[in-house]
């Protein structure tokens, strides 16, 4: 029976007590003797479950305020003892085999996240006995079952019932790997927390004694899916997600229909969704190759989609479409009747819209749930031999943050367009130039080495689609180092420019705007995106 091992004795000691009473009761009903410690033992006893305190079992009391509970040969010998090989020495020392260990660890992450957490608080929430038991049981998975996740309780009981209270080697091995993942994540959290308090190992230690970035960067992600290939067909790939992502995202999205998401689908969908999150009004973002090619607001998402599509229908073909409100049947119909689309994502999708999209079975339809606030965290970029780590770019200016530096004041409509345009530029690859008017992108110039050429491309895009640049606002993700970009914008018909400012030649650039009768707004915030 696949090296099945019966469960006769279990040791249970958990910090997270979710489902533990029901699980322990199920074990007891199947004839399993239960050992336990501290608060877990008290909880089980209060619920009428027969339990033996570990201190009674070992003949050695808990001591040092609970620091020493399970660190005893009768415990670890029972867990580590190899059945059929160590039986004689176990019997000689009165060590009974322990067939199952159910442990999860002190809530270190929750403790250090609390306001006012002291170093002493953090230290006291470093679990010692727990990880030791977990690793011992996982090492001896040939004979012992280790359970660290409450989500596995039902699975364990179900298999025991199917196998005369036994668990297979395949299950024990799978649970053992989960246990090593559990302790690895736990130790990583501890190393990250204390690693912010010490200098780096490298030569450049200046100013990093107290840093938000730990000395070693330890992160754990869980594989969600293997992929046919990566960015290109000769590259293998997989998609990993955070253990408990809190923010609605492509990682949390539920796929309603369509082919499996590809590597590029996920990257582009993330770009589209994060951009559309910037807007409160009904909005649509269409992305191609990680760049917005059309963004617009509307009285509803249908109007927003129609206007976003109008920016660049050619690039929208085979693109990703994101909305910030529920996808309805009317909008879904407009999409599938008008264009080929790879992915549609929205906070929710109406039943009627699902029926519409179902006619195009290859279209990937996702709903990600509503978002409230953005979570903090790091962005990472792999370089050969290393990793660049930075805060997520969650910066965004409001009307009160804007500084008008030109002689001409922008109109109310220009200010509104400037803020819209600025939000879009944040998500366009640098050098980024965006033309907009009336809450709609008119032209997008992305990823050029020269800012002037990005502006030219934005103008060409607009002209190709018959869109009027005259009177538009222009956003630039970074400052203009020379006046040539402003001269080119004026020639195209731009009337207002929003940019970070901060160039050594700001005076020259502002003077150019004044010469052309343009309004110029500084944000004081840059949004490079590489």
From Swiss-Prot:
InterPro entries: AICAR_Tfase_dup_dom_sf, Cytidine_deaminase-like, MGS-like_dom, MGS-like_dom_sf, PurH-like. One of its GO terms (molecular function) is phosphoribosylaminoimidazolecarboxamide formyltransferase activity. Residues 1-148 form the MGS-like domain. Keywords: Hydrolase, Multifunctional enzyme, Purine biosynthesis, Transferase. Its EC number is 2.1.2.3, 3.5.4.10. It holds the Pfam family AICARFT_IMPCHas. It comes from the Bacteria. GO terms for biological process: 'de novo' IMP biosynthetic process. It catalyses: (6R)-10-formyltetrahydrofolate + 5-amino-1-(5-phospho-beta-D-ribosyl)imidazole-4-carboxamide = 5-formamido-1-(5-phospho-D-ribosyl)imidazole-4-carboxamide + (6S)-5,6,7,8-tetrahydrofolate; IMP + H2O = 5-formamido-1-(5-phospho-D-ribosyl)imidazole-4-carboxamide. GO terms for cellular component: cytosol. Pathway: Purine metabolism; IMP biosynthesis via de novo pathway; 5-formamido-1-(5-phospho-D-ribosyl)imidazole-4-carboxamide from 5-amino-1-(5-phospho-D-ribosyl)imidazole-4-carboxamide (10-formyl THF route): step 1/1; Purine metabolism; IMP biosynthesis via de novo pathway; IMP from 5-formamido-1-(5-phospho-D-ribosyl)imidazole-4-carboxamide: step 1/1. The IMP cyclohydrolase activity resides in the N-terminal region. NCBIfam families: PRK00881.1, purH. Belongs to the PurH family. This is Bifunctional purine biosynthesis protein PurH. It comes from Vibrio vulnificus (strain YJ016). The gene is purH.
